[in-house]
UniProtKB/Swiss-Prot annotation:
UniProt-annotated binding residues for Ca(2+) 1: S139, D142, D143, D265, D348
Modification sites for Pyrrolidone carboxylic acid: Q24
Glycosylation positions in this chain: N51, N117, N255, N502, N626, N644
Post-translational modification: Both Ser-747 and Ser-758 become phosphorylated when T-cells are exposed to phorbol esters. Phosphorylation on Thr-760 (but not on Ser-758) allows interaction with 14-3-3 proteins.
Name of the protein: Integrin beta-2
Function per UniProt: Integrin ITGAL/ITGB2 is a receptor for ICAM1, ICAM2, ICAM3 and ICAM4. Integrin ITGAL/ITGB2 is also a receptor for the secreted form of ubiquitin-like protein ISG15; the interaction is mediated by ITGAL. Integrins ITGAM/ITGB2 and ITGAX/ITGB2 are receptors for the iC3b fragment of the third complement component and for fibrinogen. Integrin ITGAX/ITGB2 recognizes the sequence G-P-R in fibrinogen alpha-chain. Integrin ITGAM/ITGB2 recognizes P1 and P2 peptides of fibrinogen gamma chain. Integrin ITGAM/ITGB2 is also a receptor for factor X. Integrin ITGAD/ITGB2 is a receptor for ICAM3 and VCAM1.
Lineage of source species: Eukaryota, Metazoa, Chordata, Craniata, Vertebrata
Topology, Cytoplasmic side: 726-771
Source organism of this protein record: Mus musculus (Mouse)
Subcellular location: Cell membrane; Membrane raft
UniProt entry tagged with the keyword Zinc-finger: no
Length: 771
């Protein structure tokens, strides 16, 4: 049952792949030929039937999905729909190959993937090259002694796996600059802590033995090796691995399975660590062996892990990290980045290295990674893996199957898709760690293989050839059937007459420019008509009412973006019935004379409010200056408007009967209070006004009394301030005089000269004073 499962999954994946290709849509843009059509998308097809498009219809209607073209009446034989194709080529010479087919030719249509199957069958006894790369720092002394004894055992273990095995040897320590090694001359000669111990000077990498099938030679060359030493714990192992991968001729790699055993008891330096030793140049990934020594290690930084992973994959080398127990987790993290690599726990003295290599090889050879060489961005490759153990994965960036047994095939479905028309190119698919490859030749599928109809004389008016259903006109002729003669005018000059307002779009993108005039397309939308000098108009792009253009055919019609309403209707979408009954006030005046009626509703002038435009809340009080002046001239024949009252106050009618409105009380031109009442009538600035008969005039103030009182007050305040100042100065002088009198009474005078000094000096004998 499990044996059938991969094939069943493969069939289902193929059906899904075909189904997804059929269900695609066609999104076209500026399509004028079959080539343009098939590049528009994988779902687009082209109809080459003659006269498939009618008058005014663009050639772009020939481009659509196959289903739509069939519905439009295009015969199936006239539909051009080139598909992406994969043509595998199998080796017929009977050579033993682990990958098949050996070559595949793809014809790729943009956006449509081509799929093909790659089968891997693991062969028994495939040749192996094994290179043993050993850390010779002082802590590996016991390991070196054991490896010297295991040369024959290593080659014998290879012969148990394969009929053709070879083995080589190399060693490494670290860069020979501080802080990686002690640069004292004595320490450079003998870096070991025990001076009596024979040690060789430190080095970055030494290629000791080229790959060979002679176990005695291996044992002899390894037996000559001496231990060395360095300062810090991490070693320069990545430098050594890079040289092993970058120097295939010096190492002696064959085009077979390549294994690299990396034996160490510590970590590793990587890119950036070289700066500690003033080494700033990045590692270039090239071979720099001179006399089997990496002599330029102090010029280049350590490689990065990613750089090393790429180089190992490029060189098809599978590393086996034989490390001590404390380093297993560190190198397991490294194998997550480096494909087709394994980790084995090395005993403290490397006595188990033979079994470790055998176990790691079986683990590596039973897992297959299918990958490809570097591709441009326009190509995308995905893998569907169908493994013999029942596991599967879909749409991954590389194929992956584990537990692959000898002679038990596993199948990968490879899908290749181009995002655009590409140039012819090729790439290689290979199983990592194995030598077999699949060469994939990619060719573009961007042309239509239409029937040749150019021999028919009646087509294209004899002035062109028919290609895929459309005319390709001779020089000097243009048009759908080459009916227009340019008469020396360029197509740019003719098209200039078809561009509105010097636009870059010909005929608004909705027509063809034929002999300098726009011939509008027939729209795909039912009942839609495109018209106008530049095909800029139609009969559907107008405002809608009740979800219908211009309210429906019974209300109006659309004409180039504006509704033309039928009698009895109005509005931008013919949404209104033509009537004014809803706009009449109680006096049957439309909008009170302060607005206009639209859609049977008042549109009021600024400052007035619906429904009848009677109120003006933003106008403020009616008691304004011009109304007060009108009341003054109409009632009392005076004021600013006295001479032209009939003109300035034409909208006001003086009433003798009081009005029931809020009165206004304002000052007139003479300062008297005048009281009047206003009643607004229909229209703007039309009022009835009633003015009270009497004026309230208030007597003015006594100016002389105010001025005289002010002057007297100022004088009195000045006199008072002078009196206060005089009193203060008198009190100050009196206080000073009394203080002077008091000081004079205290002073006492004598007749001694204070500068006189006596000439007599008396000295007392202290002994005499005691007696």
């Amino acid at each position: 049952m499990l044996g059938l499962r991969p094939s069943l999954l493969l069939a289902l994946a193929g059906l899904f792949f075909l189904g997804s290709a059929v269900s695609q849509e066609c999104t076209k843009y500026k399509v004028s030929s079959c080539r343009d059509c098939i590049q528009s998308g994988p779902g687009c097809s082209w109809c080459q039937k003659l006269n498939f498009t009618g008058p005014g219809e663009p050639d772009s209607l020939r481009c659509d999905t196959r289903a739509q073209l069939l519905l439009k009446g295009c015969p199936a034989d006239d539909i051009m729909d080139p598909r992406s194709i994969a043509n595998p080529e199998f080796d017929q010479r009977g050579q033993r190959k682990q990958l098949s087919p050996q070559k595949v030719t793809l014809y790729l249509r943009p956006g449509q993937a081509a799929a093909f199957n790659v089968t891997f069958r693991r062969a028994k006894g495939y040749p192996i090259d094994l290179y043993y790369l050993m850390d010779l720092s002082y802590s590996m002394l016991d390991d070196l002694n054991n490896v010297k004894k295991l040369g024959g055992d290593l080659l014998q273990a290879l012969n148990e796996i394969t009929e053709s095995g070879r083995i080589g040897f190399g060693s490494f320590v670290d860069k020979t600059v501080l802080p990686f090694v002690n640069t004292h001359p004595e320490k450079l000669r003998n870096p070991c802590p025990n001076k009596e111990k024979a040690c060789q000077p430190p080095f970055a990498f030494r290629h000791v033995l080229k790959l060979t099938d002679n176990s005695n030679q291996f044992q002899t060359e390894v037996g000559k090796q001496l231990i060395s030493g360095n300062l810090d714990a991490p070693e320069g192992g990545l430098d050594a691995i890079m040289q092993v991968a970058a120097c295939p001729e010096e190492i002696g790699w064959r085009n077979v399975t390549r294994l690299l055993v990396f034996a160490t008891d510590d970590g590793f330096h990587f890119a950036g660590d070289g700066k500690l030793g003033a080494i700033l140049t990045p590692n270039d990934g090239r071979c720099h062996l001179e006399d089997n020594m990496y002599k330029r290690s102090n010029e280049f930084d350590y490689p990065s892990v990613g750089q090393l992973a790429h180089k190992l994959s490029e060189s098809n080398i599978q590393p086996i990290f034989a490390v001590t127990k404390k380093m297993v987790k560190t190198y397991e993290k490294l194998t997550e980045i480096i494909p087709k690599s394994a980790v084995g726990e090395l005993s403290d003295d490397s006595s188990n290295v033979v079994q470790l290599i055998k176990n790691a090889y079986y683990k590596l050879s039973s897992r297959v990674f299918l990958d490809h060489s570097t591709l441009p961005d326009t190509l995308k490759v995905t893998y569907d893996s169908f493994c013999s153990n029942g596991a599967s994965s879909i749409g991954k960036s590389r194929g992956d199957c584990d537990g692959v047994q000898i002679n038990n095939p596993v199948t990968f479905q490879v899908k290749v898709m181009a995002s655009e028309c590409i140039q012819e190119q090729s790439f290689v698919i290979r199983a990592l760690g194995f030598t077999d490859t699949v060469t994939v030749q990619v060719r573009p599928q961007c042309e239509c293989q239409c029937r040749d109809q150019s021999r028919e004389q009646s087509l294209c008016g004899g002035k062109g050839v028919m290609e895929c259903g459309i005319c390709r006109c001779e020089s000097g002729y243009i048009g759908k059937n080459c009916e227009c003669q340019t008469q020396g005018r360029s197509s740019q000059e003719l098209e200039r007459n078809c561009r509105k307002d010097n636009s870059s779009i010909v005929c608004s993108g909705l027509g063809d420019c034929i002999c300098g005039q726009c011939v509008c397309h027939t729209s795909d939308v039912p009942n839609k008509e495109i018209f106008g000098q530049y095909c800029e108009c139609d009969n559907v792009n107008c405002e809608r009412y009740n979800s219908q253009v211009c309210g429906g055919s019974d209300r109006g019609s659309c004409n180039c973006g504006k509704c033309s309403c039928k009698p009895g209707y109005e509005g931008s979408a013919c949404q209104c019935q033509r009537s004014t009954t809803g706009c009449l006030n109680a006096r049957l005046v439309e909008c009170s004379g302060r607005g206009h009626c639209q859609c049977n509703r008042c549109i009021c002038d600024e400052g007035y409010q619906p429904p009848m435009c009677e109120d003006c809340p933003s106008c403020g009080s009616h008691c304004r200056d011009n109304h007060t002046s009108c009341a003054e001239c109409l009632k009392f024949d005076k004021g600013p408007f006295e001479k032209n009252c009939s003109v300035q106050c034409a909208g006001m009618t003086l009433q003798t009967i009081p009005l029931k409105k809020k009165p206004c009380k304002e000052r007139d031109s003479e300062g008297c209070w005048i009281t009047y009442t206003l009643q607004q009538k229909d229209g703007r600035n039309i009022y009835n006004i009633h003015v009270e008969d009497s004026l309230e005039c208030v007597k003015g103030p006594n100016v002389a009394a105010i001025v005289g009182g002010t002057v007297v007050g100022v004088v009195l305040i000045g006199v008072l301030l002078l009196v206060i100042w005089k009193a203060l100065t008198h009190l100050t002088d009196l206080r000073e005089y009394r203080r002077f009198e008091k000081e004079k009474l205290k002073s006492q005078w004598n007749n001694d000269n204070p500068l006189f000094k006596s000439a007599t000096t008396t000295v007392m004998n202290p002994k005499f004073a005691e007696s």
